A protein has these predicted regions:
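N-terminal small-residue-enriched
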Residues: 2-92
Length: 92
């Protein structure tokens, strides 16, 4: 089986689509079938690897990159419509 998603760090709660995925496509991660995507996801975009509650941080590269603004279910697209910058993440 050819992977269609990539987990960058073992602590990440999102994975990256290696190709455009359509709703219902099965994620193949680490050469195993994993779960279905819940909506169309563009190549290079994030997919929730697990359920993420509102206010929880989204981890990529093992670091918090954004915070969920609503519950995000496993298999959903993680993007600007359901996340915001991590409060206090940027100092000027």
């Amino acid at each position: 089986m050819k992977n269609n998603a990539l987990r960058i760090n073992p602590t990440d709660n999102v994975i990256i689509a290696l190709q455009a995925l359509k709703k219902g496509d099965v994620v193949i991660l680490e050469n195993k079938k994993s779960f279905e995507v819940m909506e169309d996801i563009p190549a290079g975009h994030k997919i929730a690897l697990e359920n993420i509650v509102a206010g929880e941080k989204v981890y990529r590269y093992g670091e918090p990159i954004v915070e969920a603004t609503r519950a995000i279910n496993r298999g959903e697209w993680v993007h600007v419509h359901n996340t915001r910058p991590v409060p206090g993440d940027i100092t000027v």
